Structures are given as C-alpha cells and as structure tokens.
C-alpha cells in the first residue's frame, strides 16, 4: 500500500482531516499540503476553514503573551484588574473608527478569551448586543460540564443583526451548557408591573440564577443616542437625554453610571428587568470588551466603578487608559 493510500485510510477518506493534520500537526505549508493531496491551494484554505468552523481546530489566544506586554500590565496595575488583553491594530492601523471592523475584531478576541477562562460548573451572565451576538456565532465550541448561561437583561424584539435570545442560546450550545432565559421584556410600562413580574415563581427562579453568576460577559455601552438601547426600544431619546443630564457616561445591561462609576438612577430604572449594578459588582469575574473612541468615558467609568475584572480592549482604548488621570 503506497503512502497516499495509507493516508486515505488513516483519515477515513476525509480530506478536511487530512489537510488539518498536515498543516497543523506536521507543519506543512498550504502549498505543500496542496501538492501532497493533489488539490489546489484554494481548496486547502477551504478545508482548513471548515476544520476551524467545525471545532476540529481550536485557535486560542495565549493570554500569557497578550497579557504580559508592558501596556497591558500597566493598565492592569493602574486599575487593579486580573487580566488585560490588548487587541493589536496590526494591519487595521488607521481604521479605528470603523465600528463594524472593531466589532468583528473584539468579538473574535472575546470568544477566544471566554473559551479559555470558562470552567466546569460556571454560571455565565451575558449582556446582549451586536458584538456578543457576533461572538456567539463565531466562537469555537468547547466541551464543558454543568455550565449555565443566562442573559442579564430581559428581551426585546429581534433586529436584523441582533437576535437577543439566540445569542445566549448559541453561547450555551458552544459551551455544551444550558441556557436560562429571563422570559420578560427588558422594560415594562410601570414599576408596579416590573415588581409583579419578578414575583412570579418561574420568573423569580431565573432572576435567582443571576445572583449565582460566577462570570459575566458584556460590552461597553455609551450614553449617546447611537446606543442600541434606543434602537430596540428599551429607551427613547428623551429618556437617554435625562440620563446624560444626570451625568451618565455609560450603561451596562440598561443600568447607567457616571464618569466615576457611580450608579445614575432615573424613573425608568424601576421599569427595567435585569441585573443591577450592585449585583454585577458582586460577580467574581467580569469580562468587559471595549473599543472605539466613543466608548472611552464609558470604559473608564466602568473600571472606576468596580464592574470589571478582565478587560479586552483595542489599542486606542489602551492608549486612552494609560494617559488618563485617575480621580483623587
């Protein structure tokens, strides 16, 4: 039996497995793999992409490398964080204001990092938004035991680029876990209705899950009219202006805070169904993604408020955090 026949037998005639082994295990170049298999280099690229998408290959950020660069260490020590990951501009230098590109890069880094830090038995609270929705679709599957994923804010009607319940469900699926949904809107018409809904046993039980979160995963949210909370109907522009007038610079799961991280409370707070900032602060590991100049103040406020333990940022945000002066 010749070498080609042996390889075909070893990999059960699966060209994806064969290409993956040659490229990642034997260290062959894509051109060499193509020659060995008798296919084009483009075909090899497609095989390797299929392997990543199907979970045959796990590409992880080495947190010891990315977290040990001088800037990351300085930010970690300055804000008393557990871990800081800076996503380098690389070939995207000069494109920091491209929000779509930023979202793609942060979602990939966030998915890789979450994959590394998630542990068996974790209860993971996730916010919803476009970055997390994108991450849920692209993160690599990981086999975990007894992981529960719960959204930290009630739901709203789905948008073309954002399906709220699907995001938490997909993350749970990728982590071999189960999803716990709040089964309530993010905002209701009155404070009384909000209290009555939370008193319902089935809803109460899921809110209780929030108090048992061991990790939380969320993205920077500013207090500008571009915030998705307005687009999906949680707030209107007048209500957002009220928060700004009260000093709000950022928002996490519908809860606003000022430049020093102190909660900013308005009438609508009593109608929002989700985790509170006080509850969020109690979670052991709080993983925060931030990128883009319009999120600088919100990122700083979140750090000062104690809502973050693990920070993943772009280079621009890292430069801002290194240069900013802390309040005395």
UniProtKB/Swiss-Prot annotation:
Pfam families named in the record: Sugar-bind
Ranges annotated as DNA-binding: 72-91
Keyword Acyltransferase carried by entry: no
GO biological process: regulation of DNA-templated transcription initiation
Regions that span the bilayer: none
Gene Ontology terms, MF aspect: carbohydrate binding; cis-regulatory region sequence-specific DNA binding; DNA binding
Cellular component, GO, one term: cytosol
Keywords noted in UniProt: DNA-binding, Transcription, Transcription regulation
PANTHER family cross-referenced by the UniProt entry: TRANSCRIPTIONAL REGULATOR LSRR (PTHR34294:SF1), TRANSCRIPTIONAL REGULATOR-RELATED (PTHR34294)
Family: Belongs to the SorC transcriptional regulatory family.
Record-given protein name: Uncharacterized transcriptional regulator YjhU
Gene name for this UniProt entry: yjhU
């Amino acid at each position: 039996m010749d070498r080609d026949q042996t390889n075909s037998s070893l990999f059960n005639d699966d060209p994806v497995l064969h290409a993956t082994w040659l490229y990642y295990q034997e260290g062959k170049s894509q051109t060499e793999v193509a020659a060995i298999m008798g296919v084009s280099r483009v075909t090899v690229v497609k095989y390797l992409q299929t392997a990543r998408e199907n979970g045959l290959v796990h590409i992880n950020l080495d947190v010891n490398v990315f977290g040990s660069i001088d800037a990351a260490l300085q930010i970690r020590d300055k804000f008393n964080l557990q871990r800081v990951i800076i996503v380098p501009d690389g070939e995207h230098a000069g494109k920091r204001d491209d929000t779509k590109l930023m979202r793609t890069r942060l979602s990939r880094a966030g998915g890789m990092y979450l994959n590394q830090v998630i542990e068996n038995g974790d209860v993971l609270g996730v916010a919803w938004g476009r970055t997390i929705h994108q991450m849920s679709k692209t993160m690599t599957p990981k086999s975990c035991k007894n992981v529960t994923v719960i959204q930290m804010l009630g739901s709203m009607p789905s948008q073309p680029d954002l399906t709220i319940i699907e995001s938490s469900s997909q993350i749970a699926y990728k982590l071999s876990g189960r999803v716990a949904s709040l089964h309530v809107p993010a905002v209701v018409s009155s404070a009384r209705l909000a209290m009555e809904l939370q008193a319902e046993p089935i809803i109460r039980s899921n809110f209780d899950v929030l108090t048992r979160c061991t990790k939380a995963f969320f993205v920077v949210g500013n207090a500008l009219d571009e915030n998705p909370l307005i687009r999906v109907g949680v707030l209107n522009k007048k209500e957002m202006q009220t928060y700004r007038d009260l000093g709000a610079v950022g928002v996490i799961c519908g809860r606003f805070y000022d430049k020093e991280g102190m909660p900013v409370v308005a009438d609508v707070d009593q109608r929002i169904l989700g985790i509170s900032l006080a509850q969020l602060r109690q979670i052991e590991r709080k993983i925060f993604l931030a990128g883009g100049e319009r999120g600088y103040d919100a990122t700083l406020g979140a750090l000062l408020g104690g809502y973050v333990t693990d920070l993943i940022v772009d280079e621009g945000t890292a430069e801002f955090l290194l240069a900013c002066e802390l309040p005395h």
